[in-house]
């Protein structure tokens, strides 16, 4: 470790102790000498004993800076690991940092463009439109067509700072993992690795641009979602240029009501958009918090969403989608046995899991939910409780499902904020049933056959040769099996004959020796011994040789 990283580690530990985070660890992890070392090296006591654990963790992460703030925000979505109280505390973390010098921003932009800003842009505004922990946004006008655009540029040296903090987090997680043991529910190393994947994706702005282009193409003719245009030729790893949009933040319900927005339709479209992205396109926006979602000012009676920041996207396999859809349908049919079977069939939990015990655990969690009307049941909450239950049966973490659960909770929260009477089940059920019918019905079978036709057309001419080769192999195998069987039988016959001669010779020699000791007539005793020795020699010589059959 470098001096700089040691200093950073010291600061992180000191901050954690200042907020008494060590008090939140189980007693077996903090023996008497731990407190002694704490006072010797840091001279610190818990300064926030009056605050609950979740609030102390939030304050510590806030003080440690942007990387830890984003980590806290990510943790707030892992409600399969944290209690609701802790998750709600961490959800209040705000990714707001002072802007960096516009001269440095200009320098970074020109380095990516490999040209002066004035070559491509007019009216570049040195005052940033927004500033966050990873990047900063400036406005300008595109010189080529006069379009209003925004330039998003990474903060200077942000990659080094992020990787340095990630290294510390990984080391701390590994240490905690060893302390907590293999059966711990929190799995800190797994959580940090999940965060690493997320934040490293946000450090590559070119990837964000490509994601936005793909999502835009998926909804190019949609009346429900608009994704701003990306100027791909001006997009790089540390800089992207995109169309500037004018919309109302989805969280500003007062402004939406003031312009007469159809909030019921807007809320229902949000749910439909989510399921369309997941089940139709298999490519969904996984960071749809209110700061990334706007509503168009155009035709409020037929409103549509505007989506920003496509740095974090999710995908599911076809199997994941099928199991997920069946899970929801099984839940609303109260078929808990089927839910347990689906988790095992999908490989999310081990094949040797006790299905009956899992079914009962699911029933205990899910059955009370039906005390509420269907329109009040939360899809995200259902998924969350199922994941929490599955974790008790050693569910293998599924990062794509964690992203899905987080996004679903966001979508539900937004939908019910816009229109509290939103019935998610009535909105989603027809979509899920139609998708399932398309996957398992005659049309699905025909589509799969059609999809495989080019493959079979290419390989069909090889079929006669393959059949001939397989028949020949079968015939040769049959011949070889017969030969092996004959050799085995002969080997066994020789072995039996040899064993018979050796046993007989031993009996004759023993009998001859007994007769000789009893002073009997000599010739029978010597004859018995002689024949026995002869048979022993014959038996020994007739033994089958030890070679492979």
Curated annotation (Swiss-Prot):
This is Probable protein kinase UbiB. It comes from Shewanella pealeana (strain ATCC 700345 / ANG-SQ1). Is probably a protein kinase regulator of UbiI activity which is involved in aerobic coenzyme Q (ubiquinone) biosynthesis. Keywords: ATP-binding, Cell inner membrane, Cell membrane, Kinase, Membrane, Nucleotide-binding, Transferase, Transmembrane, Transmembrane helix, Ubiquinone biosynthesis. Pathway: Cofactor biosynthesis; ubiquinone biosynthesis [regulation]. Its EC number is 2.7.-.-. Belongs to the ABC1 family. UbiB subfamily. GO terms for biological process: regulation of ubiquinone biosynthetic process; ubiquinone biosynthetic process. It is found in: Cell inner membrane. The lineage of its organism: Bacteria, Pseudomonadati, Pseudomonadota, Gammaproteobacteria, Alteromonadales. HAMAP family: UbiB (MF_00414). GO terms for molecular function: ATP binding; protein kinase activity. The active site is at residue 287. It is a multi-pass membrane protein.
């Amino acid at each position: 470790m470098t001096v700089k990283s040691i200093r950073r580690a010291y600061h992180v530990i000191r901050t954690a102790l200042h907020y008494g985070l060590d008090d939140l660890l189980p007693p077996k992890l903090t023996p008497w000498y731990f407190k002694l070392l704490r006072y010797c090296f840091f001279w610190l006591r818990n300064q926030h004993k009056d605050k609950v654990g979740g609030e102390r963790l939030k304050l510590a992460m806030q003080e440690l800076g942007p990387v830890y703030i984003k980590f806290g925000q990510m943790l707030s979505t892992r409600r399969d690991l944290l209690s609701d109280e802790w998750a709600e505390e961490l959800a209040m973390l705000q990714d707001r940092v002072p802007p960096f010098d516009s001269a440095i921003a200009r320098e970074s932009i020109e380095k990516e463009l490999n040209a002066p800003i004035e070559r491509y842009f007019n009216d570049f505004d040195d005052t940033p439109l927004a500033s966050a922990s990873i990047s900063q946004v400036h406005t300008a006008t595109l010189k080529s067509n006069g379009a209003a655009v925004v330039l998003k540029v990474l903060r200077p040296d942000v990659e080094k700072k992020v990787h340095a903090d990630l290294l510390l987090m990984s080391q701390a997680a590994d240490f905690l993992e060893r302390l907590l043991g293999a059966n711990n529910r929190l799995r800190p190393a797994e959580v940090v690795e999940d965060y690493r994947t997320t934040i490293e994706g946000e450090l590559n702005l070119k990837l964000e641009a490509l994601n936005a282009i793909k999502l835009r193409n998926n909804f190019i003719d949609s009346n429900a979602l608009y994704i701003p245009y990306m100027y791909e030729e001006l997009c790089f790893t540390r800089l992207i240029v995109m169309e500037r949009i004018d919309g109302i933040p989805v969280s500003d319900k007062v402004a939406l009501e003031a312009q007469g927005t159809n909030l019921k339709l807007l809320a229902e479209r949000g749910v439909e958009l989510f399921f369309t992205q997941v089940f139709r396109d298999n490519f969904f926006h996984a960071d749809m918090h209110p700061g990334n979602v706007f509503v168009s000012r155009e035709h409020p009676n037929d409103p549509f969403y505007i989506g920003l920041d496509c740095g974090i996207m999710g995908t599911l396999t076809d199997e994941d989608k099928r199991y997920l859809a069946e899970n929801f349908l099984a839940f609303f049919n109260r078929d808990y046995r089927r839910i347990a079977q689906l988790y095992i069939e999908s490989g999310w939990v081990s094949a040797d899991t006790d299905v009956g015990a899992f079914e009962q655990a699911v029933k205990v969690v899910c059955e009370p939910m039906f005390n509420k009307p269907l329109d009040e049941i939360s899809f995200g909450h259902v998924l969350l409780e199922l994941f929490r239950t599955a974790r008790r049966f050693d569910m293998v973490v599924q990062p794509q499902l964690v992203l899905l659960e987080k996004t679903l909770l966001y979508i539900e929260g937004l939908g019910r904020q816009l229109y509290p009477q939103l019935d998610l089940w009535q909105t989603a059920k027809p979509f899920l049933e139609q998708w399932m019918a398309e996957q398992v019905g005659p049309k699905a079978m025909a589509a799969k056959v059609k999809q495989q036709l080019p493959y079979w057309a290419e390989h069909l001419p090889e079929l006669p040769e393959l059949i001939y080769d397989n028949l020949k192999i079968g015939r040769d195998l049959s011949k070889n099996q017969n030969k092996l069987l004959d050799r085995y039988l002969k080997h066994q016959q020789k072995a039996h004959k040899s064993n018979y001669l050796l046993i007989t010779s031993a009996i004759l020699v023993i009998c001859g020796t007994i007769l000789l000791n009893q002073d009997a007539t000599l010739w029978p005793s010597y004859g018995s011994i002689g024949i026995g020795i002869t048979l022993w020699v014959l038996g020994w010589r007739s033994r089958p040789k030890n070679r492979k059959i």
